[in-house]
Amino acid sequence: MGNVVYKLTSKEIQSLMAQTTFETTKLPQGMKARTRYQNTVINIYSSGKVMFQGKNADQLASQLLPDKQSTTGKHTSSNTTSIQYNRFHCIGSDEAGSGDYFGPLTVCAAYVSQSHIKILKELGVDDSKKLNDTKIVDLAEQLITFIPHSLLTLDNVKYNERQSIGWSQVKMKAVLHNEAIKNVLQKIEQDQLDYIVIDQFAKREVYQHYALSALPFPDKTKFETKGESKSLAIAVASIISRYAFVKHMDHISKKLHMEIPKGASNKVDLIAAKVIQKYDIQQLDTISKKHFKNRDKAIHLMNQKYNK
């Protein structure tokens, strides 16, 4: 049995716990949560350390925590790069919505040539995580007019269907990234491509295992953590995917006549409970990711209200 240990921030722990159901009561002192997932025991401690225990502990940890390096020394970092991507013609890909209870999963691949670099810098293209929604929308609506791209949206109904038949979120993202990249390749002169750069959410071997189809140009394909800061192609893909997510969330808010929040916080639990109260659980499931623990928390809030 292998053991892998990570040190996580509170936000990273929240993101991990959103990916499957954890026990949070009747635990040993010092333990915050635990679960058994894919034949691996995951223990989260109050200190911020997370231990994966099991035959496939290392592989599962890489899937759930692709950007982290274990404190056990089993992982060697392959995320450093000396490639100056903005000097080359690149396809970049990124996604939005993966850590949000409400809303779809959106993935974009975008082709940025050297001729695009100057105008992108003048427009102020940057990592979408640093931009507010208004700036995201303004930038994206300009970018989609001249950047070859492919934008794919997995709505909540289809997301939940795939999750119910055993697809992990990592698999969904791998399939969507690969399809978006292949779509962009049909829109460009392929001899004018130097690199395909994927904002890393899983190690290469995990991505290849789940993608359902081969990498189009494996020798040209790179995986980069925090890729939006290393490649304008990823930054563009990040902005367009975030734009699609923001617009979809706006649509949900208008449809339900209430502000639907992003993320997976306690505020999200309260709004989810309000959706159940105003509509029903079926309506909630059409606009959310059912496997997030926010669903159970919302149901618990409703039960508390009516059992007083």
From Swiss-Prot:
It catalyses: Endonucleolytic cleavage to 5'-phosphomonoester. This is Ribonuclease HIII. Keywords: Cytoplasm, Endonuclease, Hydrolase, Magnesium, Metal-binding, Nuclease. It holds the Pfam family RNase_HII. The keyword Hydrolase applies. Its cofactor is Mn(2+); Mg(2+). Its EC number is 3.1.26.4. Residues 88-304 form the RNase H type-2 domain. A divalent metal cation binds at D94, E95, D199. Its main location: cytoplasm. Belongs to the RNase HII family. RnhC subfamily. PROSITE patterns: RNASE_H_2. GO terms for biological process: DNA replication, removal of RNA primer; mismatch repair. NCBIfam families: rnhC. One of its GO terms (molecular function) is RNA-DNA hybrid ribonuclease activity. HAMAP family: RNase_HIII. It is found in: Cytoplasm. GO terms for cellular component: cytoplasm; ribonuclease H2 complex. Manganese or magnesium. Binds 1 divalent metal ion per monomer in the absence of substrate. May bind a second metal ion after substrate binding.
